[in-house]
A protein has these predicted regions:
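CheY-like receiver
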Residues: 40-41, 45-92
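Alpha-helical interaction/dimerization surfaces of two-component signaling modules
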Residues: 15, 19-23, 42
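Conserved acidic segment of CheY-like receiver
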Residues: 1-12, 16-17, 51
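A structural micro-motif
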Residues: 1, 27-28, 76
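Conserved Asp/Asn-Gly motif in the active-site loop of CheY-like receiver
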Residues: 30-37
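Short, aliphatic-rich N-terminal leader segments
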Residues: 9-10, 31, 44, 55
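A generic structural motif
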Residues: 24-30, 46
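Short helix-capping segments at alpha-helix termini
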Residues: 22-26, 72-74
């Protein structure tokens, strides 16, 4: 399986990548992008199975990115992450 990590914070991306033994849970390839626009490009080209995505990012947020990918990758598993505690925003 392929995992795409989309987050505008490089430290977050590298921390998530280095903290988990991805191959032990069936992830063969870990891809990354630094915002929603680049995430769209990588997802369209590589067709990941799972997207681990920040909610708030410049240019295109994670929710908008996943909405645009919905028709192209209908079986994708999205997982959102956020450093914000704004519960109303996260509920959306």
């Amino acid at each position: 399986m392929k995992l795409l990590i989309v987050d505008d914070e490089e430290l977050t991306r590298t921390g998530v990548i280095s903290s988990i033994d991805w191959t032990s849970i069936g992830i063969d390839e870990v891809l990354q992008a630094d915002d929603g626009i680049n995430g769209l490009e990588v997802a369209r080209a590589k067709k990941p199975d799972i997207i681990l995505c920040d909610v708030r990012m410049p240019r295109l947020d994670g929710i908008q990115m996943l909405e645009r990918l919905e028709g192209l990758l209908p079986d994708i598993v999205p997982v959102f992450m956020s450093g914000y505690s704004d519960k109303e925003y996260l509920k959306a």
